[in-house]
UniProtKB/Swiss-Prot annotation:
<keyword id="KW-0456">Lyase</keyword>
<dbReference type="InterPro" id="IPR027540">
    <property type="entry name" value="Coq4_euk"/>
</dbReference>
<keyword id="KW-0472">Membrane</keyword>
<keyword id="KW-0831">Ubiquinone biosynthesis</keyword>
<feature type="binding site">
    <location>
        <position position="211"/>
    </location>
    <ligand>
        <name>Zn(2+)</name>
    </ligand>
</feature>
<comment type="subunit">
    <text>Component of a multi-subunit COQ enzyme complex, composed of at least COQ3, COQ4, COQ5, COQ6, COQ7 and COQ9. Interacts with COQ3.</text>
</comment>
<keyword id="KW-0809">Transit peptide</keyword>
<keyword id="KW-0999">Mitochondrion inner membrane</keyword>
<dbReference type="GO" id="GO:0006744">
    <property type="term" value="P:ubiquinone biosynthetic process"/>
</dbReference>
<feature type="binding site">
    <location>
        <position position="210"/>
    </location>
    <ligand>
        <name>Zn(2+)</name>
    </ligand>
</feature>
<dbReference type="GO" id="GO:0031314">
    <property type="term" value="C:extrinsic component of mitochondrial inner membrane"/>
</dbReference>
<feature type="binding site">
    <location>
        <position position="226"/>
    </location>
    <ligand>
        <name>Zn(2+)</name>
    </ligand>
</feature>
<comment type="similarity">
    <text>Belongs to the COQ4 family.</text>
</comment>
<keyword id="KW-0496">Mitochondrion</keyword>
<dbReference type="GO" id="GO:0005743">
    <property type="term" value="C:mitochondrial inner membrane"/>
</dbReference>
<dbReference type="Pfam" id="PF05019">
    <property type="entry name" value="Coq4"/>
</dbReference>
<comment type="pathway">
    <text>Cofactor biosynthesis; ubiquinone biosynthesis.</text>
</comment>
Length: 335
């Protein structure tokens, strides 16, 4: 009997060990889960009751102070304190890098306006901006612009009113040009890298008036039109980036585009830019209700041949030649 009892206890031993082997890991997992999820539950309850945060601490103020400290730390690496809203002071080597990189990108990717914006500021040397400032100071309208520092936006221009002006007014012509080209005066980038606040405003004014030059000359914003207006700005205002654009940008165009520019539009742009009134002194916001023909005469601006029409005529001629060629080819090809 004793032997039989020992055999039975020995036989049941592995089963108990197996159960114990299952129970111990399960208990450990339960304990670990309770610690993790219980802690998260207690944390959530504390947050709900408002007990998590110290009520005596202004967390928003602390975050603002940390941000301010980071800005100060960054400012300590700059050559000077920012002198106007949005100003990013650059070291001389950074300006050279900005010029090199933006110049390279502008040549190979002229369709990206951001490259043009950076190149414009990188080449806006203080001597050029000071000369432009003196040009404005020598004219009554220019002096008023510098004093009042108007900002050209759709809100200031009242686009809904421009749409209702007589069709012969500059304001209506400008409105129709914006609509046709699908652009807005609100899209002009702010000035960031020019150090002197007055110089920065002058360059901002030049940048914001760019579309007025397009509208009064009826020039589209396609690449040929942009090069033409840049050449006009270079001849009239001496803008370094505009001069570079007028010289280098045509090199990447098709032969027929270069021919149009060199034979028609660049000579017109240089001639008009040298002979017309300094466009930086025009208070364009006050010219919107004037007769556009009279305004062109006052500014000594003559219209160039319509670039859109010339391109359409060229495309129609090419289509006609291709059709004749294909017709002759089919006629001479044996069946």
């Amino acid at each position: 009997m004793l032997r039989l009892s020992l055999l039975r206890s020995t036989a049941t031993l592995p089963v108990k060990c197996q159960r114990r082997g299952l129970i111990l890991p399960a208990a450990a997992m339960y304990t670990l889960g309770s610690l993790i999820f219980g802690k998260e539950a207690r944390l959530a309850d504390a947050m709900e009751r408002g007990e998590l945060h110290n009520k005596n601490v202004d967390y928003a103020k602390e975050a603002e102070e940390r941000t301010e400290l980071r800005i100060r730390a960054l400012a300590n690496t700059r050559p000077m304190e920012p002198r106007y809203n949005g100003h990013v002071p650059l070291h001389r080597y950074e300006k050279l890098l900005l010029f090199a990189i933006s110049g390279w990108n502008s040549f190979f990717h002229p369709e990206d306006g951001y490259n043009i914006v950076q190149l414009g500021e990188a080449t806006a040397l203080p001597v050029f901006l000071e000369n432009l400032k003196q040009t404005m100071l020598s004219d009554s309208s220019g002096r008023r612009i510098l004093k009042e520092q108007p900002n050209i936006t759709t809100e200031i221009l009242h686009m809904d009113k421009l749409a209702k002006l007589p069709h012969n007014t500059f304001g209506y012509v400008y409105y129709q040009w914006l609509k046709r080209e699908n652009v807005s005066p609100d899209t002009r980038a702010p000035v960031k890298f020019i150090d002197d606040p007055m110089h920065a405003y002058i360059f901002k004014r030049y940048r914001q008036c760019h579309d007025f030059y397009h509208a009064i000359t009826n020039m589209p914003i396609i690449i040929e039109g942009e090069i033409t207006i840049k050449a006009l700005e270079g001849a009239n205002l001496g803008v370094p980036m505009a001069i570079l654009g007028g010289i280098l940008a045509p090199l990447r165009l098709k032969k027929v585009q270069r021919k149009r520019l060199y034979n028609i539009y660049l000579p017109w742009a240089v001639r008009t830019g040298l002979s017309c009134k300094p466009l930086i002194n025009v208070y364009w916001e006050e010219m919107l209700e004037k007769d556009v023909t009279a305004l062109r005469k006052e500014l000594k601006i003559t219209l160039p041949p319509d670039l859109r029409t010339m391109r359409k005529e060229r495309a129609a001629l090419r289509k006609e030649i291709d059709a004749k060629y294909n017709s002759q080819k089919r006629a001479t090809t044996p069946a």
